[in-house]
Design a protein with these regions (language model features):
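Short N-terminal micro-motifs specific to bacterial/archaeal maturation
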Residues: 26, 108-109
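A short, charged, amphipathic alpha-helix used as a generic interaction element across diverse proteins
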Residues: 31-51
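Short, charged, surface-exposed hinge/linker loops at domain edges
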Residues: 1-2, 44-108, 115-124
């Protein structure tokens, strides 16, 4: 869903990003190109651990009238809510046997199952 992000920039600082549809949810970005990814991450952290239903996006005019929008730039960010589906599903993958063994050893050393280890690795690489 597309939401409004209010972006502010002061000289010598990162871009400040406020997401008014998510009260108290904010982020920062070094470049305007980073706003989308950082807004996504902020919403995921905002929703973590709670029963969360994505809000309906406020109209552009309503966001533009907010006090926090003054002297800011309004941008549309596309927030993906697939992270809310935490069902565990079986997956069949192919890899060299030695890599399966290395992953198994590393997972055991970390106190994880192979599946949990691979999920953590995927998250660490930005999935």
């Amino acid at each position: 869903m597309k939401y409004i992000a209010i972006v502010h920039k002061n000289e010598g600082t990162a871009y400040g990003v406020t997401l008014p549809d998510f009260p108290g949810c904010f982020s920062a970005a070094d470049t305007l190109d980073d706003v989308q990814a950082n807004a996504q991450e902020a919403v995921e952290l905002y929703a973590h651990g709670e029963a969360f239903t994505p809000p309906e996006p406020m109209p552009f005019e309503q966001a533009a009238a907010l006090e926090e929008a003054q002297d800011g730039v309004l941008m549309l960010v596309d927030i993906c809510f697939d992270f809310l589906d935490e069902r565990v599903v079986p997956v069949n993958i192919s890899m060299p046997a030695y890599m399966r063994d290395r992953i198994g050893k590393a997972a055991k050393a970390a106190g994880l199952t192979r599946s949990a280890y691979l999920v953590q690795a995927a998250r660490a690489y930005g999935a």
